[in-house]
Amino acid sequence: MGCAASKLDNEDAVRRCKDRRRLMKEAVYARHHLAAAHADYCRSLRITGSALSSFASGEPLSVSDQTPAVFLHTPPPPLSEQSPAKFVPPRFSPSPAPSSVYPPSTSPSVASSKQPSVMSTSSNRRRKQQPKPRLPHILSESSPSSSPRSERSNFMPNLYPSAYQNSTYSATPSHASSVWNWENFYPPSPPDSEFFNRKAQEKKHNSDNRFNDEDTETVRSEYDFFDTRKQKQKQFESMRNQVEEETETEREEVQCSEWEDHDHYSTTSSSDAAEEEEEDDDRESISEVGTRSEFGSTVRSNSMRRHHQQPSPMPQVYGGAEQSKYDKADDATISSGSYRGGGDIADMKMVVRHRDLKEIIDAIKENFDKAAASGEQVSQMLELGRAELDRSFSQLKKTVIHSSSLLSNLSSTWTSKPPLAVKYRIDTTALDQPNSSKSLCSTLDRLLAWEKKLYEEIKAREGFKIEHEKKLSQLQSQEYKGEDEAKLDKTKASITRLQSLIIVTSQAVTTTSTAIIRLRDTDLVPQLVELCHGFMYMWKSMHQYHETQNSIVEQVRGLINRSGKGESTSELHRQATRDLESAVSSWHSSFSSLIKFQRDFIHSVHAWFKLTLLPVCQEDAANHHKEPLDAYAFCDEWKLALDRIPDTVASEAIKSFINVVHVISAKQADEHKIKKRTESASKELEKKASSVRNLERKYYQSYSMVGVGLPESGPDNQHMLDARDPLSDKKSELAVCQRRVEEEMVKYSKAIEVTRAMTLNNLQTGLPGVFQSLTSFSALFMESLQTVCTRSYSIK
């Protein structure tokens, strides 16, 4: 048996399938650890930023006035906001919230500094039309009699205050739906006639005021819709008539919201209508580009007059430096600038200057958080999070068994009684649907199951072949010896049975091999391409944030200690230093694990892919085509890119920063030891001084008689020193202890100075090197993955 098993294992097909099974098992293992390492790396970035911020809070280091400011290159606008020759201004949302009315684009540099907002204006074009207010579905334009607006009101929807403009529909599911839940709706008592009279007077008064305001605003605005006074008068008259015609309709339609004295309404229009309206706004808002650079977090009112009153500055001129706060730092100066070239935003820079180490580290922490957030998409691809676990159970049908009845596919919360049992059964129809979303984890698990099955089938087929060869040799020997026909028939029957088993197992091998190839080409390859693009975009974003950190951290070279007397290191600050060392160590280990397991995963997949290109059966040799060759070239390019990545440089840079923090922590520990010795010596001095004072009270009954002779102890009753003072030894010991305390105090002061100087020097020399290495590594990794992604485009 041992020889037969050894011969079976030495068969090429069995050995190859065994290697395929092993490689797929290694790929599953590496993917699992890659997902964990990726999650640890993103988490370590956040923890390192927080630890740096806590450490910087205890360091009184300021940036000198001679330190030059740093220039930060802001990322380009999204492609959706650019065109080859025109720049579409941002659309204004009808929501009154400042963040949604005009959302500022944040810069990856500092926490609260805002990226200069660049808008398109033109002196000879019409103002961008503000979107129409959207009514709830029950009052929307879908009903001919329910719309309080007409085509004539498109000039300025907010020009005249009306009932529906002053009303608010809360964005609840009952109000947002097309059919209201009237059981939960309790309308108030209807208003009297005085209410409507008062509202009509207010409408008339506000309409007159709006006419005057609009006239003044139109004169000073650079977007005039009409050039003649006659056209303006006609439009105003038509709007006045419209308001008068719609008064009664508005009273009836938005009566419930007027009773509740709401100020605005919520948008409950359908998504299709919103998309059509936004497309109309996009087509109407395209204009000649005039670039304007401004800075600061501004709040837009419902009308757009404040925005249009400001003139556009000349292009290619940097805006003046303004004050921006960053974590309560009021004088962190940020200047911004942009220039116009053919209508496109060609470059934007920000000049940043921070006051102290805390502000610098907070800006670095913000970019750490952004870099960690850029890996969330890859985390989803690698199946991290609760949503991926819930997706795995989507094919299970839940049956909740209660004491009274059997409720299928119902939640246990539908009844007050707890369920007696919850049973799951698999839904086989939902397992392999063509349009169902499949994950990389499930694909690898299925491939591993198929590879195990293929190995067993190949092993069985080759075993039958070996047994078939033995039976043939036995038959030949029996025929040569001339044995009886019964034995020959028995041997022939065994040979026939083995031939049937070989045919069946060969068909099973072919079916399994085809299933593996199909799963490889339809699921695994697209998922690998998606994962590669995900890593590429992740490292591209990380490169931007690390580059920003590298620019910001240059300011630590200008740090100085403005405090005249060195402050001792508190216990809280020593703990923050230890936490920083632990965080950077975790960062280093997770970075090494991330690169290692990504290499292991791609190496395993690459080697397995190479073996799958070889046909298991000779009959399948003609079925191989070019598609897997292109996919294999993609995997091979990815493997070579990972092998060429100089991750050791970045890893050593992070490791060197661990040593830097460790040296700071060691100096703080030495300072703490000297402080303990000083405190111990001070306590001993106080104890001995107290003992001497007690003895003085006992022998002399006074503090002023120390070392002085008793009365009438000398000639002429004069006081004189007592040479036989019993406290002289105690006083000598007290003097020695006092000198030792003074020496310890001097050592403690020097230890504080050494700690402060060592901290400043290590931060200035160690911290910039980390971000320089990370910036270079992320740039090289991004470029390598871009080459791999380019190779993926050739996959059919």
From Swiss-Prot:
GO cellular component, one term: nucleus
Keyword presence, Plastid: no
Annotated coiled-coil segments of the chain: 227-255
Cell division listed as a keyword: no
Chain intervals with Acidic residues compositional bias: 273-283
Region Disordered, annotated ranges: 57-174, 190-342
TM regions (residue ranges): none
Bias (Basic and acidic residues): 195-237
Phenotype when the gene is knocked out: Under high nitrate concentration, seedlings are slightly smaller and display later flowering than wild-type. Under low nitrate concentration, seedlings appear normal. Nitrate accumulation of the seedlings and roots is significantly lower than in wild-type, however no difference of nitrate accumulation in leaves. Nitrate content differences in roots and leaves may be due to the reduced expression of NPF6.3/NRT1.1 in roots and the increased expression of NPF7.2/NRT1.8 in leaves.
Single biological process term from Gene Ontology: response to nitrogen compound
Feature: compositional bias, Polar residues: 163-174
Skewed-composition ranges (Basic residues): 124-135
Low complexity bias: start-end ranges: 98-118
Keywords annotated in UniProt: Coiled coil, Nucleus, Transcription, Transcription regulation
Subcellular location: Nucleus
Tissue distribution: Highest expression levels in leaves and roots, and lowest in flowers and siliques. Also expressed in stems and seedlings. Also expressed in stromata. In flowers, expressed in the pistil, junction of filament and anther, and vascular tissue of sepals and petals. In roots, expressed in stelar cells including the pericycle, phloem and parenchyma cells. In leaves, expressed in bundle sheath, phloem and parenchyma cells of the vascular tissue.
Entry superkingdom: Eukaryota
General function of this protein: Required for nitrate signaling. Regulates expression of the nitrate-responsive genes NIA1, NIR1, NRT2.1 and NPF6.3/NRT1.1.
Subunit relationships: Interacts with NLP7.
Protein known as: Nitrate regulatory gene2 protein
Protein source organism: Arabidopsis thaliana
